[in-house]
Amino acid sequence: MRLTEAVVYRLRAIMAEKNITPYYFHVNGGIAKSSISQLFNGKQGKVTLDFLYQFTSTLGISLREFFDDPIFDEVTD
C-alpha cells in the first residue's frame, strides 16, 4: 500500500469515528476544497507533513496519534 493510500484510509477511519465529512476540513480547517477532493479521490501525489498537519490539527489530534495505527505497517513505498 502506498503512503498516500494509508493516509486516506486513516483519515476516513477517523472521519467515520467522529461522524464528519471531507467538507468539515474546508469549513473548520480552511483547507481548499480542491485539495481535499484531490486527496480523497487519489489524485494527490505526495502528502507533505505540513498538508497532513492541517488535517490532524482540524481533527484535534497529533501527528503521533494519527500515525499510531497498524495501517502504516502495510506501507511499502
What would you call each of these model-derived segments?
Residues 38, 67-77:
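Short, charged recognition helix plus adjacent turn
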